[in-house]
Amino acid sequence: MAEISAKQVKELRETTGAGMMDCKKALQENQGDMTKAIEWLRQKGITSAEKKSGRQTAEGLVESYIHTGGRIGVLVEVNCETDFVARREEFKELVRNVAMQIAACPNVEYIQGSDIPEAVVAKEKEIEMGRDDLGNKPDNIKEKIVQGRIEKRIKELCLLDQPYIRDQNVTVEELIKQTIAQLGENIQVRRFTRFVLGEGIEKQEVDFAREVAEQAGQLAPEAESTTETADATSETTTEKSSAKKKKKK
């Protein structure tokens, strides 16, 4: 993969208006060729998406998705600019796919990296700095490793950074940008909630061995009672038989 300089990224960003990470990826995918990188961004719909990113989104849809078996459920709100686009089948399909994506991603808690509180990032850094495999490494190397791990962890937590479940070569963010280019309006995921059946409920542990033993203990008295009943019945029958013999005499 070609080495991409900050100057190249800046130049492509100024030309297309795309984000820095998108520009860097475009250049990497095209071995630093500026013309091909611009075409790549246009094909992905990223340049037009960036131009529309500041426009207000007040319309849209709230979509629900229940996974097979009813054990996982999702509610997600995706906004667009007009009611006309909200009624378009392409927009509805996007919202359904985003809901399914959330259902398939148990680690996702935020929409994008900027939504993550500083306290969460600081806690992640504290955890990584304390790992045993970093103990003997110089501080400057340790810092780079920790930073890389934190960036990876942040991506795991963010919806927009997830590989799209139907095409692993595209992220959810890129999928949305493609739809923006197609429909000509700004589109944003505003909020979502993921439900898991029984989540947060402490389940009572069952001691099956003890349960079987208790059942066996309950059966014993019943067996004794049955034996006593049988003995009593036998004694009654014997007494009746003796009485009949006395009458015959």
From Swiss-Prot:
Family of the protein in this entry: Belongs to the EF-Ts family.
Region Disordered: start-end pairs: 215-249
Residue ranges of the region described as Involved in Mg(2+) ion dislocation from EF-Tu: 82-85
Transmembrane parts of this sequence: none
Pfam families listed in its UniProt record: EF_TS (PF00889)
KW Cytoplasm (keyword) present: yes
Key word Cytoplasm present: yes
HAMAP family found in the cross-reference section: EF_Ts (MF_00050)
Segments forming a coiled coil: none
Positions with biased composition (Low complexity): 222-236
Location in or out of the cell: Cytoplasm
Molecular function, one GO term: translation elongation factor activity
Function: Associates with the EF-Tu.GDP complex and induces the exchange of GDP to GTP. It remains bound to the aminoacyl-tRNA.EF-Tu.GTP complex up to the GTP hydrolysis stage on the ribosome.
Keywords: Cytoplasm, Elongation factor, Protein biosynthesis
GO CC term (a single one): cytoplasm
Gene that this polypeptide is encoded by: tsf
Gene3D superfamilies assigned to the protein according to its UniProt record, in alphabetical order: 1.10.286.20, DNA helicase RuvA subunit, C-terminal domain, Elongation factor Ts, dimerisation domain
Source organism per UniProt: Rippkaea orientalis (strain PCC 8801 / RF-1) (Cyanothece sp. (strain PCC 8801))
Protein name: Elongation factor Ts
